[in-house]
Amino acid sequence: MRIEFFMPMVPPTLTFQDRQSIVVKGRGMLVDTPELKAVKAKLRDHLAPHVPATPFTGPVRVISKWCWPTEGTDHVNGEYRITKPDADNLSKMLHDLMEKLGFFENDSQVMPVPEKFWADVPGIYIAIEEL
């Protein structure tokens, strides 16, 4: 089985690495900031219409292409984006949300292929295929 879709949006620049550390009863904890909660909600809302009827159960390759807008920059369509955030951190957050929505049973099944680009049409392209 293979699923692919494009979510038009300006991709987020916050990742799980941007959690805030707090101390509660002498113990350190990481909590989502209001901004990170908004990013997760935005991604969840865009992912929800694409959840498969049944989750993938075996290994899957998840290709994610994060495309930031070229408008107002000196970058050209298709140029690799080599600035933060890290593609690995973006894909970790994406896969955690996809697991919670029911794309697959556990994100340990995922063989990630994240890429970052500048694009005339911003958004996130996702392809999921059974291996």
What are these regions (language model features)?
Residues 1-131:
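Acidic, proline/glycine-enriched N-terminal capping motif
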